[in-house]
Curated annotation (Swiss-Prot):
NCBIfam families: PRK13531.1. SUPFAM superfamilies: P-loop containing nucleoside triphosphate hydrolases. ADP binds at residues 23, 49-54, 196. Component of the RavA-ViaA chaperone complex, which may act on the membrane to optimize the function of some of the respiratory chains. RavA functions as an ATPase. The lineage of its organism: Bacteria, Pseudomonadati, Pseudomonadota, Gammaproteobacteria, Enterobacterales. Coiled coil: none annotated. This is Regulatory ATPase RavA. Pfam families: AAA_lid_8 (PF17868), ATPase_RavA_C (PF12592), bpMoxR (PF20030), LARA_dom (PF20265). It is found in: Cytoplasm. It comes from Salmonella schwarzengrund (strain CVM19633). The gene is ravA. It catalyses: ATP + H2O = ADP + phosphate + H(+).
Amino acid sequence: MAHPHLLAERISRLSSALEKGLYERSHAIRLCLLAALSGESVFLLGPPGIAKSLIARRLKFAFQRARAFEYLMTRFSTPEEVFGPLSIQALKDEGRYERLTTGYLPEAEIVFLDEIWKAGPAILNTLLTAINERHFRNGAFEEKIPMRLLVAASNELPEADSSLEALYDRMLIRLWLDKVQDKANFRSMLVNQQDESDNPVPASLQVSDEEYQQWQKDIGAISLPDPIFELIFTLRQQLDNLPNAPYVSDRRWKKAIRLLQASAFFSGRDAVAPIDLILLKDCLWYDAQSLNLMQQQLEILMTGHAWQQQAMLTRLGGIVQRRLQLQQQQSDKTAFTVIKEGGMFSRRPHYTLPPEASASTLTLLLQKPLKLHDMEVIHITFDRSALELWLTKGGEIRGKLNGIGFAQTLNMEVDNAQHLVVRDISLQGTRLALPGAAEDSMPAEIKQQLETLENDWRQQHTRFSEQQHCLFIHSDWLGRIEASLQDVGEQIRQAQQC
């Protein structure tokens, strides 16, 4: 078996070759290739003339030896046109019911069925067995069919509660395509002279039958780690609790997990990673409403939980709360405390300064800076005698803001804990403390917790960086996930700097 990274590079080059001359169809080609390499089915929804059939034809060139079959369904289509005509000779000579399948669906590796919902019950029933079991009943015999990829297409969805739902449920990947939108791409498409029937894939990139069979075994060996299962189960629970969520059968979940294993395998990994889960948005929707819903739910999962973003923010919130508690405790210890001396007949308590405040002028620090008289203030200088008079009799108190200029009127009070509190115009308050009493450094407990959290964040970011190289995921998703992780990292850094 090729080295995992060499295999991933080969599949990437194979996809690039298949995409040549197809504009704004890279994602569709890549998912169809993933489906072909893992033996799954694809449904393409979109208006006529947007290269749905060409996508299917291209996939034939991914393999060294692959036969293709395509058919446009109508209400009058018969099983003979899809599965092959009856052998008149076998019926006449031996009385045996047998179809001549050469050149028809039972002998094709790549199958494209356009306007699939117009097929009649006889075709649909046989097709269900072919998709489910990869077998075709030809007369008295069960024949194994080599189909690796079924691409079904239509410009409409099947009607709800119709007989078509069983077939629709078998189509694991569902892609909603539209016309070419970008101006430059539209021009390139108009002037492109490439023959659509040409093989754009070098022989060295094409997949042999032996490789394909071996890869099916290797895909099954890709592990599903417990944290990834928890994410999947969380998504399943979220969908079950939403009133308008699509019904997702257990069969579809199981097939979707195999697709995630294939994504991991062809990305050079030995286990499913969170990045692979984005593929579920193309597997679990049913109609336009559920398509948007799946997009929203996957975004919540990817930007909030897949790399522990929300869990880290919750931890950060707890650390910040603990820090505030410690700061409050420290504030209580370091705040400037006056002595209460209420007289026997005094209705108003009065206070005196503590012995350590013996200087003629006192400079007290604000435990938290405030804006006073249009100035950012970090300390206030008081005349000791004026402060003593205010503590005894009340009235107006003045102090020099940051120790400069004239003394300014202050909104100051003594709180219940006998601490001096100064307030700004919005009544935001902070306690005052003697210089040297305030502890500005971050508590060791908080510093350690923030360092641990930052290390955990770095590990998650490294995991994302290592796993983000996935051919089958659109780059827009990578940008949103990176932004969510950077936001968490920035909040941690801000907390460390406070």
